[in-house]
Structures are given as C-alpha cells and as structure tokens.
C-alpha cells in the first residue's frame, strides 16, 4: 500500500520511511472510508500494530443547492471549470472553508459563493485598495519606517491586538484541523479592520504632510494587511499573492519571491491586550444598539442627539465614550445604574411554563404580576435570576423563562436592550441640534456631488448655494466647518456654477453646485 510501497520499503529507504511514518493526517471523501482509510489502517495494524496516520479529515460530498446528489442525468451537475471561470479559485476555496465542517455535505450554489466572496475577499481587497490609494498619493514606502509600538494610538494598538489574537486563533485551529473556525476568525478580523479601524482612522490618512500619527496609521494598516495576507495565504492563495507582490516584493527585493515561501506569521504576545479588545467589543455592542434605537426613533445618524444613557455591567473610560459620541453623533454618554426614569417594565406569566408548574394559581399569578412595581421587579430578576411572589401564603418562584416582559418607553425617549446592556436615547431635539443636523446633511450632499462630478479625492473645490434663505444662512454660519469637511476653498451664495443639483434637505429645497478650482 502507498505509505510503504512509495519508498520500496522494507527493501530500502528504511530511515526515510521511519521519519515519515505515521503520517500527520490523511484526507479523502467519505466514500473512501472503507476503500482507503480502512485499508491503510488494516495493513498498518497487521505490519506494525499501529495506525498509519495521526489524524483523519473526512470530506463530505458536494451536493446541489437543494441538497441533492449531483448527477449529469439529472442535469444538476456543476462543471468545475465553468465555476472556476465564473467565480475564481479563491472564492470557491473560501466557500468550502466556511460553508460547513469538512465532513458534512456541502450545498454548492453560486449565490452563496458570491456572498462569501463579497463579505471576506471583497472587504479585504477594498481595505488593501484604500491603503494603496493613499500610499500612492503620499509616496509612502514602508521600508523607510518602522512600527514604533509605544508611539501608537489606542486604535492602532487595538487593531494589532486583534491581529495577533487572530493569527493565534488561526494557527491553533489549523493545527487542530478546525478549518471553518480558522476561516471565520480571519473573516471577523477583516471585518473589524475595514468597518471599524479604517473607518475610524480615515482622517489620519487624509492629513497633510507625513506627521508621526499618519506614519503610525500607515504602518499599523500595512502590518495588518501583510500579516493577514500571510495567515490567509493557504486558503486564498491567489489574492494574497497579489497583495504580497504589491505591498512587500515591489519595495523589498530581498523578500521571498512568493508569499507561499514566507513563514506563517509569528504571534507577538506582547501586542495582545485582552482588556482592550473586551472594551472595544463592549463599545461596538453599545454602538450597534444605539444605531438600532436611532432607527426606532426614525432619526438619521447625521442629526445630532443630546444624550444617550447606558445601563450595563461594565464601565468604559472617557476615551471609549468619545468614540461612542462621535460614532452615534451624540453630545453626551452617561452610564447609569438605574434607568427607571426613562423606561418601565410590566410582566405577564408565560403560560407554557407557568401553567404546568402552578395550575390553579395561574390567574392569581397573572393578577399579582400586573400590580408589581415593574422596575423593582426587573431589578430583583436581574440581581437574583428569579422573581418571588407570595400568593395565598405560598411562595411562587418565577424564572426569566417563566415571564413575558414588556418594556415601555417614556415619551421623548427610545431604548434598546439585551440581557446585559440597555441604551436610552433622549430624542428631544433643541434648535441648535437641528441646525447642526442641517450642516451634516449639507456636507453629505456636497461630498455626493464631488463624486458625481468626477472630482479626484484631493481636488479643491468651490461650493455654491441659492434659492433657500435658511440653508444659505446655515452655510454662512458654519462655513469654516463645511469647507474643511469637503476640501472647499470658498462658499458662494446667490448663484451657481459648475456641476449643479437640486436637493430636498429636511424638507428644505435648495440648489447647490460644485466647481473644481
């Protein structure tokens, strides 16, 4: 059999055979359980009284999108060469890594391949393209700088901590043949890198000159891109090779010829900060809930809000509060132990669980629950995990699963809650907040017009506005802020030149134009 015959063992190459036996792993489809896995095991046990392999990866069969076995006669077979031509090898590989555990059947569907390609590969490529765009504008060469960890901003240190934790997780999962877990760790990191780090750091790349903070941002993102490319190289070999050739080989002739000749990244344990990662994860959860509360209140993110109250089991430092305020466009974030001033709770019994437990007492339990001080009852439930009632001298103990809990919001406030966090938005808007919302909308509309007019990222422009006294007044009052945001040298009112467009901004109609200088 192959492990023995390939080296003509036992007639020669005894030392070579012993170095390679047993194999670290063997991989075949499930239909080879008897024909291959068992045959090898039987022969090896007979000859050596030991298994010929240390690990087995059994691959499930590939089915069509409806879970049916592929068959030419049924017409549901997919030509692999057509699929490769349509989606690319990397996208198909990534689909198989993430769709299910290797030993389970895989339902192959083009739309699923495209979705995986968009969520991971597209996000990674867009982040890489962002870096390349601004690196070319600034003639940035990573070989001329070093990553000075002690000089980095908190966001930089957080990204590097996430990076090293990810590399560690990928290495551990691959070493233990947990392929989907390794792929999902990479996908989670790339999502954080693109949709949080880059989005929060854009203005650092836009800054003039090459100050230390801008260098730090470049070097942090460069390090993350190169490292994640190396970690993902075994899974998406072609895209990562492109990234490596442009980011590394093009500026360092001494680097290995290919990313596949590089060592797998080593983990920098001293960069890993679990507390920082936990705090940022808590922050992100608050931001997600804050956005949901805004949607419930039907208030766009460009409209500033006065205050958000947060009730949670943790506290965040002022640094993280500032990020929340900026991300949610909120003036103040207040952590509170009690939010009874803004919301109230009411309780009903969950018939499915309370009925079998207490039967005839069900109606009395329902009546007692309706008379409770909802906020005190919720506090008891959260602190002890149960709610105790006294009904006809009998102690009734209800768990959270026994209760239907309704949260009512006070007028002028909107809340979102999960098991550990509640956020409450004060939706009362002052005239000053409303005017600031107009400014945000104006900046957004001007940026849209820049793109539609085909202006380059760094082009200076002149902005025009007419036909609405309120909008014109706001643009005059906040001219410096607007000009700074849209790279404008001047705001002209009462006339228009260049690319012109009519807008309806918060029910105010205005004509605006942009002109390249």
Model region roles, listed by residue range:
Residues 1-2, 47-85, 104, 113-517:
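Feature 926 captures the class I aminoacyl-tRNA synthetase adenylation module centered on the KMSKS loop
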């Amino acid at each position: 059999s192959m492990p023995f015959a390939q080296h003509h063992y036992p007639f020669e190459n005894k030392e070579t055979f012993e170095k390679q036996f047993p194999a670290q792993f063997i991989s075949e489809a499930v239909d080879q359980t008897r024909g291959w896995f068992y045959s090898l095991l039987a022969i090896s046990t007979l000859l050596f009284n030991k298994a010929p392999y240390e690990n087995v990866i059994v691959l499930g069969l590939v089915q069509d999108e409806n879970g049916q076995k592929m068959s030419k006669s049924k017409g549901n077979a997919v030509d692999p060469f057509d699929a490769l031509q349509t989606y690319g090898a990397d996208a198909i590989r990534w689909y198989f890594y993430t769709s299910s555990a290797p030993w389970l059947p895989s339902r192959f569907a083009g739309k699923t391949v495209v979705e995986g390609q968009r969520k991971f590969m597209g996000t990674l490529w867009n982040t890489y393209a962002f870096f390349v765009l601004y690196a070319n504008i600034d003639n940035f060469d990573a070989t001329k700088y070093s990553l000075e960890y002690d000089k980095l901003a908190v966001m930089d240190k957080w990204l590097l901590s996430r990076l090293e934790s990810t590399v560690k997780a990928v290495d551990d999962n691959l070493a233990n043949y947990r392929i989907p877990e390794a792929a999902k760790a990479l996908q989670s990191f790339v999502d954080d890198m693109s949709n949080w780090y880059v989005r929060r750091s854009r203005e650092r790349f836009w800054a003039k000159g090459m100050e230390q903070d801008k260098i730090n941002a470049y070097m942090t993102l460069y390090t993350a891109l190169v490292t994640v490319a190396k970690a993902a190289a075994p899974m998406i070999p072609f895209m990562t090779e492109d990234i490596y050739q442009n980011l590394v080989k093009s500026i360092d002739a001494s680097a290995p010829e290919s990313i596949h000749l590089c060592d797998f990244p080593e983990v920098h344990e001293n960069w890993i900060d679990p507390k920082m990662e936990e705090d940022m994860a808590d922050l992100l959860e608050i931001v997600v809930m804050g956005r949901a509360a805004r949607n419930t209140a039907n208030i766009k993110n460009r409209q500033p809000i006065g205050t958000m109250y947060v009730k949670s089991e943790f506290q965040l430092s002022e640094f993280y509060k500032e990020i929340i305020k900026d991300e949610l466009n909120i003036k103040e974030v207040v952590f509170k132990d009690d939010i009874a001033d803004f919301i109230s709770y009411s309780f009903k019994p969950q018939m499915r669980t309370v009925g079998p437990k207490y039967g005839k007492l069900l109606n009395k339990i329902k009546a007692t629950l309706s008379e409770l001080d909802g906020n005190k009852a919720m506090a008891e439930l959260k602190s002890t995990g149960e709610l105790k009632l006294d009904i006809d001298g009998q102690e009734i103990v209800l768990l959270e699963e026994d209760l239907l809990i309704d949260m009512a919001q006070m007028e002028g406030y909107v809340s979102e809650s999960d098991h550990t966090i509640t956020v409450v938005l004060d939706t009362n808007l002052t005239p000053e907040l409303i005017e600031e919302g107009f400014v945000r909308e104006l900046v957004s509309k001007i940026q849209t017009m820049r793109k539609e007019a085909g202006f380059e990222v760094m082009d200076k422009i002149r902005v025009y506005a007419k036909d609405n006294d309120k909008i014109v007044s706001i643009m005059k009052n906040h001219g410096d802020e607007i000009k700074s945001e849209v790279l404008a040298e001047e705001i002209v009112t009462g006339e228009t030149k260049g690319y012109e467009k009519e807008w309806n901004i918060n029910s105010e109609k205005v004509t605006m134009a942009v002109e390249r200088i």
